[in-house]
Each structure stands twice: as structure tokens, then as C-alpha cells.
Amino acid sequence: MSIVSYEPKVSDFLNLSKKEEILPKALTRLKTVSISTKDIISVKESETLCDIDLLINVPLDKYRYVGILGAVFTGEWLVPDFVKGGVTISVIDKRLVNSKECVIGTYRAAAKSKRFQFKLVPNYFVSTVDAKRKPWQVHVRIQDLKIEAGWQPLALEVVSVAMVTNNVVMKGLREKVVAINDPDVEGFEGVVDEFVDSVAAFKAVDNFRKRKKKVEERDVVSKYKYRPEKYAGPDSFNLKEENVLQHYKPESVPVLRSGVGRAHTNA
């Protein structure tokens, strides 16, 4: 019984622009595209979670970032085609701790299909430092297949297409500065100022500070605002330093001197 083998084409995952096709690799963002050798997984249990190397033979030491453009999973059932049951295969990024967010893609296949194949496009980069730690895993869960423990009912073959590069930030300040043809200082400063002003984070912080300042001013006014006696509670007579309105500037108080010191008599 032969296992289905598939050699993916780069064009299946990546569409090169006319500029990228003409220009040398050093002048384009695309540095190299490598097709790694296959990684074979044999499922021994009904549920398996194992690491998978999607970057075999990819030159990670020469670059800073690597992206998985696509991966082709080919499965071959090692049981008769009339057997009931199926399998669920999930590709996982084990760096993410949230079980709902770590799943990159999921595929289901019935045992009666005998062989199956699916393509996964993660479409994101990781640093080569993380890539060397093999951040990807495959979770295989066989369902409703009546087979004793210890046997191998399924074989998986994975072939991936990877892209490596030294720069992944394409819309940052670095790209704008490099694009300046005239080495004029004013032109450089203009690009920097325009970029900083356009960043949403700076605007968000500025707006937050303004809102916070207004809220604090309202709190100061309401703190010392006069309230009628009917709203007074049992704790309103507890003198606290923050509840006492203090005046540090002396104020003149008029005194009526007529009648001062004279005894009060009833007419």
C-alpha cells in the first residue's frame, strides 16, 4: 500500500507580482522560498498531540523572520475502506495559551475516503528564534473507529512552503525614510513628523489624557459643591481632612461695632 505523495508548487501559495518576477531577490521583499522535506506522522492512539517541523531544510540562520505560506497535509488510512469512523486534524500554534485562538485550521475526514488531502495557509511570520523552537503542533483525534490501542490506523505526510526575509515591517517609518530620494534634512523631518502624527496610538493617548483631565476637573467641582441639609447622612458630620474645605488666604470679615459691649436690657 503506497502513501500518497504530493510535491507542492510555489505558485499554489504565492502569486508573484511582475516587479518581483523581474527584479533580483535582493531588491524585493521576497528573499527566498523553500519547500521543506516531508514530515511523516504515524498516529498510534485515538488522540495525539505532537510537534511538527514545518521548516526542515529552511535556512533559518541567515534570516530574521520566516513565514509559512502554506502546508499540504496528505493522509492515508491504514485500514480497510469499509471501516466506519473518521479523524479530526487541527494545526496548532503552541505559543498561544488560549485554546480558541491557538488553532490555525481544522480538517475532518472519514475513514471510508481511504486517502485525503488538504491545504492550510497560515499566512503570518514568526521570528527565526521562535521557529527553531518548533512552535507548531498537530492534534489528531480519531473518532468512532473500533480498533485496539497500540495499532497505527492512520499516516500523515506534511509538506510546507516557507518564505524567509530580514524585514517584515512594510508600512513603518523605516520604509518611508529609505524611500526618500533627496537627502534633504527638511524632507526627512517632514516624513518623520507625518508618520508620527498618523500613528493612531499617539492620537489615542492624547485624547485619553484630555478626557482624564476633564474628568478630574469635574470631580474637584462636585467634591466641594454645596448640598442641602436634607441630603446629610449619619456620616456627614465625621470630619475628614479631604472633606474639609480649607482657605489659606485670609479674608476680611465686617464687624458691627454699634452696641458692642453694652448690656442688653428689656424695654
UniProtKB/Swiss-Prot annotation:
GO biological process, one term: transport of virus in host, cell to cell
Alphabetical keyword list: Host cell junction, Host cytoplasm, Host cytoskeleton, RNA-binding, Transport, Viral movement protein
Localization, UniProt: Host cytoplasm, Host cytoskeleton; Host cell junction, Host plasmodesma
One of the record's GO cellular component terms: host cell cytoplasm
Molecular function GO terms recorded: RNA binding
Top-level taxon of the source organism: Viruses
Entry similarity comment: Belongs to the tobamovirus movement protein family.
Functional description taken from the UniProt entry: Transports viral genome to neighboring plant cells directly through plasmosdesmata, without any budding. The movement protein allows efficient cell to cell propagation, by bypassing the host cell wall barrier. Forms a ribonucleoprotein complex with viral RNA. Binds microtubules and modulates microtubule stability. Can bind double-stranded DNA.
Name of this protein: Movement protein
Organism name: Turnip vein-clearing virus (TVCV)
Lineage: Viruses, Riboviria, Orthornavirae, Kitrinoviricota, Alsuviricetes
Gene name, Swiss-Prot/TrEMBL: MP
